From Swiss-Prot:
One of its GO terms (biological process) is regulation of DNA-templated transcription. It comes from the Eukaryota. This is Transcription cofactor vestigial-like protein 1. It comes from Mus musculus (Mouse). Residues 76-90, 98-110 have a biased composition (Basic and acidic residues). Residues 55-121, 287-307 are annotated as: Disordered.
Length: 307
């Protein structure tokens, strides 16, 4: 009421007390009031709110101070109790064999002072444990199998474009410069090579790989008067006379028995037997003269192509 007097508002004594008042939570609510109530209500509520906030702030600050003091005093106690709990848990886990997975086991060869990422990297460099005898035998058998597979693969690969090879070539072309490559002499199991193949390379020397096809050939080089041996070109020169017609005397000497004994059975002959027989007979007819072979006799030509 003193504040109302200071504001200069005069109120009679009969109307100074409110008609009805309600007391609730330390605050007074005026239900009926005469005069300017707006300023009074605002001032009343502002004062009531200030009184409510102050004890809450004081209590919260005192509570936080107590917490900080308690934490400062009991800090060491909580740390020691926490470490003791961890040790107890680890000891209980190690006692139980079923709970060993929960205990972190340090890897062998790792340093405790190393960070976790370096420990992970160093674990890759640890030497592997020694393998058991069974594992060693398995690994050795696998290695041997791999080597055998490599060897078989290298042997199965065709080194030459020749079709149907009978046997591998045992002679290397690098060791001998005059060696003819195996691709020039393909071997067929059902027939013998005709001498036309060797006529392509007159300057090359015949090698032992060629004569396993012709068993009647002899690897005897020419012997010169001074004693030195010459190349095997005289055999190639004998084959050059096969392109010319034969004499009747030479054809008589070429009997079927001699042909079968020197060059194999006649069942393996190609579909053109006349030409092939003429080539075989030419091997034994090395003494025929060129003048008689070149004579234009129709009878001789007929006999040369028909037996």
């Amino acid at each position: 009421m003193e504040e109302m007097k200071k504001n200069g508002v005069w109120i009679p004594e009969s109307s100074q007390k409110p008609v009805k008042t309600e007391w609730n939570a330390g605050s007074v609510i005026f239900t009926y009031f005469e005069g300017d109530i707006n300023s009074m209500v605002d001032e009343h509520f502002s004062r009531a709110l200030r009184n409510l906030k102050r004890p809450h702030k004081c209590s919260s600050s005192s509570h936080s101070d107590n917490l900080t003091l308690k934490n400062g005093v009991n800090k060491t106690r909580t740390d020691t109790s926490h470490t003791d709990r961890e040790r107890k848990v680890e000891s209980s886990q190690t006692e139980n064999s079923g709970e060993l997975k929960d205990v972190p086991v340090e890897e062998k060869g790792t340093n405790k002072s190393m960070p976790p990422n370096q420990r992970h990297l160093s674990s890759w460099t640890i030497a592997q444990p020694a393998a058991s005898p069974e594992n060693g035998a398995r690994s050795s058998s696998l290695d041997e199998y791999g080597l055998k597979a490599m060897d078989q693969h290298s042997l199965s690969m065709p080194k030459t474009p020749s079709a149907l090879p009978l046997e591998p070539w045992h002679f290397s072309s690098l060791a001998r410069p005059g060696f003819i490559a195996p691709a020039y002499f393909p071997v067929f199991p059902d027939r013998h090579l005709t001498p036309e193949v060797y006529r392509v390379f007159p300057d090359r020397h015949l090698t032992p790989e060629v004569y396993h096809v012709f068993p009647d050939r002899h690897l005897t080089p020419e012997v010169y008067p001074d004693g030195r041996c010459g190349p095997l070109q005289h055999l190639v020169q004998q084959d050059r006379y096969q392109n010319h017609p034969l004499e009747p005397a030479a054809r008589e000497n070429c009997s079927p028995a001699k042909i079968a004994g020197s060059t194999g059975s006649l069942m393996n002959l190609p579909p053109y037997p006349v030409h092939y027989k003429k080539k075989i007979c030419a091997r034994g007819a090395a003494s025929a003269s060129l003048d008689d072979e070149r004579s234009p006799s129709p009878k001789r030509r007929r006999d040369a192509y028909y037996y």
